[in-house]
A protein has these predicted regions:
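Class I SAM-dependent methyltransferase Rossmann-like catalytic core
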Residues: 2-58, 69-85
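The AdoMet/dcAdoMet-binding core of the Class I SAM-like
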Residues: 52-152, 158, 170-173
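Well-ordered alpha-helical segments embedded in enzymatic catalytic cores
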Residues: 42-46, 142, 175
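Short glycine-rich, flexible loops that bind phosphorylated cofactors or substrates
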Residues: 165-166
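Cell-envelope and extracellular/periplasmic
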Residues: 160-162
Length: 175
């Protein structure tokens, strides 16, 4: 199903909101809606709805299915910081493209992420970040294998893999 020979073939795409995303040759689609934009999509479709429903929690565990460029994770941190929330967050994120994660410290992220550049750098180098408020772990490999090994209770799930048409393995009911 997956074609590893195409994994490194990606093209940078400028979205209508001015943010950048990538187009995956392997999955024949962009990582984000080029019309909505990467940041807008992450905030409006994933982060804000999830955090509004969890606003009274002081600790959250989030499963960000398919880390990719990290927009959902980084938008979560950005939102928590800009809203002045004291929520402690642990994010677990499966990702099979280690090369992509390791390249994130050179990706052209929006200025909204300037305050978390040190986090992006740590994740790209160590696949991990932790401070008193945020803990982020990248689970390298197939999400179908890493997710069953998660021991803690997950409060929020960002299901943001490539579309069911192009990545049906992550949209089945058996996983």
């Amino acid at each position: 199903m997956y074609n590893e020979s195409l994994r490194d073939q990606k093209e940078v795409v400028l979205c209508e909101d001015g943010t950048h995303t990538l187009f995956s040759i392997e999955f024949d689609e962009p990582y984000h809606s080029t019309k909505d934009g990467a940041l807008h999509e992450s905030l409006e479709k994933h982060v804000k709805p999830a955090l509004v429903l969890s606003k009274d929690k002081t600790n959250l565990t989030i499963l960000d299915i398919c880390f990719g460029l990290g927009y959902n994770t980084f938008s979560t941190l950005h939102y928590i910081q800009t809203q002045g929330l004291n929520t402690k967050v642990h994010i677990l994120s499966p990702e099979f493209d280690e090369g992509l994660v390791r390249s994130l410290d050179t990706f052209d992220f929006p200025p909204e992420f300037d305050s978390i550049k040190h986090i992006i750098k740590s994740i790209s180098q160590d696949l991990y970040y932790e401070d008193e408020q945020f803990k982020i772990e990248i689970l390298l490999g197939d999400a179908r294998k890493s997710i069953p090994n998660i021991q803690e209770k997950v409060d929020i799930i960002y299901q943001d893999a490539f579309s069911p048409v192009h990545n049906p393995l992550l949209w089945t009911t058996e996983h």
